[in-house]
């Protein structure tokens, strides 16, 4: 059977949607990418989406750009995609997605792309499809631009703690601040204060295919262990399901047992496993 790898075009999108529908939680980042293109005032184009076609039928896909994301890739598709990535060289900051696919793809490009700064091989993906049965913290609200003075340092602190490097390095400060401001404007940022002190925040980084992917969950260090996270996350889920999407999801490092226990207490269930390869 004849196969080829090529950038997607408008004629391929129906087939992409079929892939997304197989697992919307797994593929919400791809769904968000397509929805973003639909909102553009320009003719949609997809140079960052490479498809693996077999006799004209889309079987697998690779998102390229700031992050490499394999989508429904078979062993042979990963071999073909790896060859493309080796020729182009590394331009991305991470590879992220289903663990088996990410780790196999990384094994095929590591000699030419390596070394990785860190490989996180086991990241449980958790999801909720109904509101939490836990008590909800009514003080959690959407953030607004008056919160940015407190919010941006908290976001930088959380990112640095989670990823191991500040998002402001190499001149990235303005772009990162603009990104947080965009999330605030889009009602995808949530905060809780005690008095005038910001003690909790979370964002929705991606919305697609009816799934909102939560990121950046943070409790101020001196307030951890005080029972803030569970009712606060229950409130975030309620706001998401009321305004953004019927499904809330997130993924977390397997060694962060405290966070996993908190999320499961809220009502999140383990539905998948991701892996992330981080580059400097």
Label the model's feature ranges.
Residues 75-84, 215-221, 225-242, 260-265:
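Conserved acetyl-CoA-binding loop-helix of GNAT-fold acetyltransferases
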Residues 1-30, 131-169:
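Short amphipathic alpha-helix that is part of the acyltransferase structural core
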Residues 54-56, 63-68, 131, 163-164, ...:
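Acetyl-CoA-dependent GNAT
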Residues 101-118, 230, 254-272:
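Conserved active-site alpha-helix within GNAT-family acetyltransferase domains
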Residues 3-11, 18, 24, 31-90, ...:
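Conserved donor-binding loop and adjoining core beta-sheet/short helix segment
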Residues 54-58, 65-138, 277:
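Acyl-donor-binding surface of acyltransferase catalytic domains
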Residues 89-99, 240-252:
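Conserved GNAT acetyl-CoA-binding A-motif
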Residues 96-102, 221, 250-260, 277-280:
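Conserved beta-strand-loop-alpha-helix junction that forms the acyl-donor binding cleft
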């Amino acid at each position: 059977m004849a196969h080829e790898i090529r950038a997607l075009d408008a004629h391929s999108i129906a087939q992409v949607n079929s892939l997304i529908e197989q697992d919307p939680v797994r593929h919400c980042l791809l769904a968000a990418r397509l929805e973003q293109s639909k909102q553009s005032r320009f003719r949609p184009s997809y140079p960052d989406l490479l498809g693996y076609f077999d006799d004209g039928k889309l079987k697998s896909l690779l998102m390229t750009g700031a992050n490499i994301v394999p989508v429904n890739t078979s062993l042979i598709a990963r071999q073909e995609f790896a060859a493309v990535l080796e020729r182009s060289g590394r331009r991305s900051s991470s590879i992220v997605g289903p663990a088996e696919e990410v780790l196999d793809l990384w094994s095929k490009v590591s000699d030419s792309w390596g070394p990785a700064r860190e490989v996180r091989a086991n990241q449980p993906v958790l999801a909720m499809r109904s509101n939490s049965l836990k008590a909800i913290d009514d003080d959690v609200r959407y953030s607004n631009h008056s919160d940015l003075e407190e919010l941006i340092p908290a976001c930088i602190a959380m990112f640095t703690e989670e990823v191991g490097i500040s998002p402001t390095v190499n001149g990235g400060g303005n772009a990162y601040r603009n990104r947080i401001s965009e999330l605030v404007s889009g009602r995808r940022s949530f905060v809780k204060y005690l008095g005038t002190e910001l003690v909790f925040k979370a964002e929705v980084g991606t919305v697609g295919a009816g799934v909102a992917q939560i990121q950046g969950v943070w409790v101020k260090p001196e307030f951890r262990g005080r029972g803030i996270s569970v009712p606060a996350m229950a409130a975030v889920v309620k706001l998401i399901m009321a305004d953004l999407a019927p499904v809330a999801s997130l993924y977390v490092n397997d060694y962060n047992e405290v966070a996993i226990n908190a999320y499961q207490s809220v009502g999140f269930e383990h539905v998948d496993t991701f892996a992330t390869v981080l580059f400097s």
